[in-house]
Amino acid sequence: MEPALAEEWLEWMNEVHIPQVMATGCFREVGILKVLTNAADDEGVNYSIQYRAQSLADYERYRDQFAPALQQETKARYGEQILAFRTLLEEIRPLSPLVH
């Protein structure tokens, strides 16, 4: 997204969108990461919002019952100003401190 939009978008995500997603009960954790490495031609600001579900069934329930309306709300608010895509990941090994 354009840098001028980033602060407002992040505030909206924290105050509106993420609470709506978490209120579905489909996820147990959420994290926001700022992407520091961008493609050479990308001068925008990029974030990764990561939701963690207890099970694949919880994710599928979110995808089928809640995601369409929430995605439409985001599109109505921001239109083509942001690019959003979803990637489903399976955790193989959780983050943990390095043990010597």
Describe the predicted segments one by one.
Residues 20, 59-75, 99-100:
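Hydrophobic transmembrane alpha-helix bundles
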